[in-house]
A protein has these predicted regions:
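Non-catalytic nucleic-acid substrate-recognition regions in nucleic-acid-modifying enzymes
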Residues: 1-26
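Conserved AdoMet
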Residues: 2, 29-108
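Residue-level signal for inorganic ion chemistry
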Residues: 30, 68, 98, 129, ...
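Conserved SAM/SAH cofactor-binding pocket of Class I
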Residues: 97-205
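Helix-to-beta-strand junctions that scaffold the AdoMet/dcAdoMet cofactor pocket
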Residues: 164, 214, 240-242
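Mobile active-site "lid"/loop adjacent to the S-adenosyl-L-methionine
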Residues: 197-227
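Conserved Class I SAM-dependent methyltransferase catalytic core
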Residues: 223-286
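Flexible, glycine-/basic-rich loop-and-beta segments that form/coincide
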Residues: 288-299
Length: 299
């Protein structure tokens, strides 16, 4: 029977043959998943033998990754904003850039004069935004919506996992339609969303593991990638408080189009958060007033 070090070497070789990036690290993650151990234990236990059953399972998982299945779907987990989230093919895998959106929402909550501000996460998916906000801002009330009931099931599991299930209300429905009949007109302090924004041309250029495995409903935003933004800009004003904010994530090349589209619907961009490549990634907007705020850049 091979030891842990030999198993990783074999797994990494298979992954390298399929041109999987970070092959040895990926093999280590999969072996830890199979054995139920931490990454640090791979070093301290490298000479320890692995059972035949564990070795067979490990290599099956390696072959799944070599075939293009995302690592997060194989292990069922993804870290986001310092928390561990359950993920399945029913939900988009949380991305690091979405952490900028969470950070911005938390800053707005901190600045709010409301004793218990209401935050709505539109299209919650795995629940990574809603759960992260609820965990880190205990005074908030959180609503999370999604058109997919399978996604809501995963989001509710993540809320329970992080002990905030009783503080998040989950609603099924297509964007703002989920709020109908809830007496929420002009009641929301912060509306947050990471909507589908991949356009038709870019969809053909997505990585295979994204295009072939992640839910298209959570990725594709119409011919220009703007369909969901149009709906948000058209309908959200009826639900936000007069001094409320909408916080959205956008694609790497969408700022100019979103700036034009939002202005056409009487929204003003009051803050632009740049990602680590200095690309506009998270926008904070509010309904236009006579005294337009000065645009602020933040990192």
């Amino acid at each position: 029977m091979p030891n842990l070090s030999e198993a990783i070497t074999e797994g990494a070789a298979r992954l390298e043959h399929s041109e999987v990036a970070e092959a040895r690290r990926t093999a280590g993650v999969l072996l830890c998943h199979v054995l139920g151990i931490e990454r640090t234990q791979l070093l301290t236990r490298s000479d320890e033998s692995i059972s035949e059953a564990h070795c067979e399972l490990f290599l099956r998982l390696v072959d799944r990754r070599a075939a293009g299945e995302p690592l997060q779907y194989i292990t069922g987990h993804q870290e986001f904003y310092g928390l561990d989230f359950i993920v399945t093919p029913d939900v988009l895998i949380p991305r690091p850039e979405t952490e900028f959106l969470v950070e911005r929402v938390l800053n707005l909550i901190e600045e709010s004069k409301e004793a218990s501000p209401l935050v709505v996460d539109m299209g919650t998916g795995s629940g990574c935004i809603a759960v992260s906000v609820a965990v880190h801002a205990r005074k908030t009330r959180v609503l999370a919506t999604d058109v997919s009931r399978s996604s809501l099931d995963i989001a509710m599991k993540n809320a329970a996992k992080h002990c905030v299930r009783d503080r998040i209300e989950f609603l099924a429905g297509d964007l703002l339609a989920a709020l109908a009949g809830r007496d929420l007109e002009f009641a929301i302090d912060i509306l947050a969303s990471n909507p589908p924004y991949v356009n038709a041309a870019s969809a053909q250029e997505l990585q295979t593991e994204v295009r072939d495995w992640e839910p298209h409903a959570a990725l594709l935003g119409g011919p220009e990638g703007l369909d969901f933004y149009r709906r948000l800009f058209g309908d959200a004003a009826a639900y936000l408080k007069p001094d409320g904010f909408m916080v959205i994530e956008i694609g790497y090349d969408q700022f100019a189009a979103i700036e034009e589209l939002s202005a056409a619907h009487s929204w003003e961009i009051v803050d632009v958060t740049l990602d680590l490549q200095d690309i506009p990634r998270t926008l904070t907007l509010r309904i236009m007033s006579e005294n337009t705020a000065t645009l602020r850049l933040s990192r």
